[in-house]
Amino acid sequence: VLEPYRHSHPLVDALLMWRKDERIATTYGYRWLDEHVGGDDRLRGAWTACDGAAGRMTAQNGLHNLPAQLRPAICAEPGHVFVRADLGQIEPRVLAVVSGDRAFAEATRSDDLYAPVAARLGSDRPTAKVAVLAAMYGQRSGAAGEALAQLERAYPVAMGLLDRAYADGVAGRSVRTYGGRLIRLGRTPPEPSGSSEPGSAAPEASAATGAESWAVGGADAARGRYARNAIIQGSAAELFKAWAATVRAGVAPVGGQIVLCLHDELLVHVPEAHAAEAAAAVETALQSASRLWAGTGQVRFVADTSIIRRWSEAKE
């Protein structure tokens, strides 16, 4: 309510800042520290390996939703650093694997998938990005609708898979991830609550679809969008787990340990003397894990990898 008036008076801005800080202090204050941070100053939480239709890993006690203001407190032990790796444009690259669209797979050879897609569509990069994300997450109106028509002509195989998934969802038929995990839908539209549900853990998706409601188009449309999301994000979760398991084995010889899995991001704690080796192992693990999961090397997966001392140093 007050946000539109933030700059109208210094008191309004101060009040809004206080409310934000007070919310963080209430949620992550002394009680939270006493309950969840141990005597060794480490935060631990129970993990769920396959949560919701997307099958993502989730964790309790704030591990998956720690505010940015607290991330400077997540620091490596003396003599150690973090190797932080974040998968880039993971959902569209997964779509290339799941659909078997060779033209779309060719676009993944680029570090920035949206650039070759834009060239093929004859549009600019922002429009191409909106079109790809809208195809996966449901927006069909406005600028996205016009760009989608171009996308369907350019990549009919990939778009065909999404259309079939949508039709299965509308009909209440179950769908499967690329790895074969069954996702039951039924006739009742699922509720998109919880950070592990399809569409809620993909920051790029929210940028493309805005505030689109699950109620748009009714229950049938909700099931259709859900099925489409579940296949892509569920398959992406499978790849991420294969990557994490491969990284775990790869960094063990140099004393590295995975300390956090967050959406598409890994944080590896490693002795500083072996940081470069661990970073290389993380990159190598992505290539081997993606080939094993996809059964092909035609689709390229990329990760932004950096060596940092505090989690807050990671590039957003």
Identify the role of each PLM range.
Residues 1-316:
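Conserved catalytic core of nucleotide polymerization and phosphodiester-bond processing enzymes
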